[in-house]
Amino acid sequence: MTSPVPIAVVGPTATGKSDLALDLAERLGGEIVNIDAMQLYRGMDIGTAKLAPAERRGIPHHQLDVLDVTETATVANYQQAAVRDVEGIAARGAVPVIVGGSMMYVQSLLDEWSFPATDASVRARWEAVLAEKGVAAVHAELGRVDPEAAASILPTDGRRLVRALEVVEITGKPFAASAPRIGEPRWGTHIVGVDRDTAELDDRIRLRTRLMFERGLVDEVRGLIDVGLREGVTAPRAIGYAQVLAWLDGEYDLDEAQERTFIGTRRYVRRQRSWFRRDTRIHWVDGSDPDLADTTIRTLGETRRMGER
């Protein structure tokens, strides 16, 4: 018996991916696998627009609420866990519906991507350089040992620069040698991208941001501080949470925190759009389509008829 082929619903934030994934899973007999890095965290609900259990229509969801805010989310750990989930769903005869917009997490799941081992002592040494000398010094060192990697990573992205230096030192090879191999998606996954008109999407982001603050984002952050949010590495950097933490620290007023959350989200959406639009395997649909699920299913049917898996 042939296993069901997964469907991935990807694209920018606030386009309507979650609702489409629910519709597809409901119609096709599927289970959902989250691919939003910040929705991995327990208690980070309002600021990540995580669906409440009552909104999930009784459909099983995987890779939600699997980390404490003190734990570090990593692409490598996610890949291992999500691959098990997708293959387990397919083995049960259900359709895995993968949904989210965290770019590297999407790539790790759908493409062949082997992650080099880590070395805590090597990483700690480079993290110390980052802390003591700043991101410019780390970027300059990467430029010396691996110019191609230095050119491909934002000079302000300290975490990725440190990781690149760690990989180069451990493997003795350029960082690009561990890059994903783009080709046929893993499991022959059908990839659907959801997007909207830019002005419309900006309005949706503005509304979503306002509602997050009205519905208790500040109280959510305060509660998470009590369980270690400030001690985390990745969780406190999430858009919305970082801005509320800065407000609590007196860096600016609450209106400014909300505005910065909107601007940060809009900027992130532009990055997502640029990233996903480069992937020619994605079949794009308009999130404003009133018959979006029907259109998507039709698109998937046409894909199969064209001979794609």
UniProtKB/Swiss-Prot annotation:
The record marks S102, R123 as: Interaction with substrate tRNA. Substrate binds at T13, A14, T15, G16, K17, S18. The keyword Nucleotide-binding applies. InterPro entries: Dimethylallyltransferase, IPT, P-loop_NTPase. Its cofactor is Mg(2+). GO terms for molecular function: ATP binding; tRNA dimethylallyltransferase activity. Its EC number is 2.5.1.75. The keyword ATP-binding applies. Keywords: ATP-binding, Magnesium, Nucleotide-binding, Transferase, tRNA processing. One of its GO terms (biological process) is tRNA modification. It catalyses: adenosine(37) in tRNA + dimethylallyl diphosphate = N(6)-dimethylallyladenosine(37) in tRNA + diphosphate. ATP binds at G11, P12, T13, A14, T15, G16, K17, S18. Monomer. Belongs to the IPP transferase family. Catalyzes the transfer of a dimethylallyl group onto the adenine at position 37 in tRNAs that read codons beginning with uridine, leading to the formation of N6-(dimethylallyl)adenosine (i(6)A). This is tRNA dimethylallyltransferase. The gene is miaA.
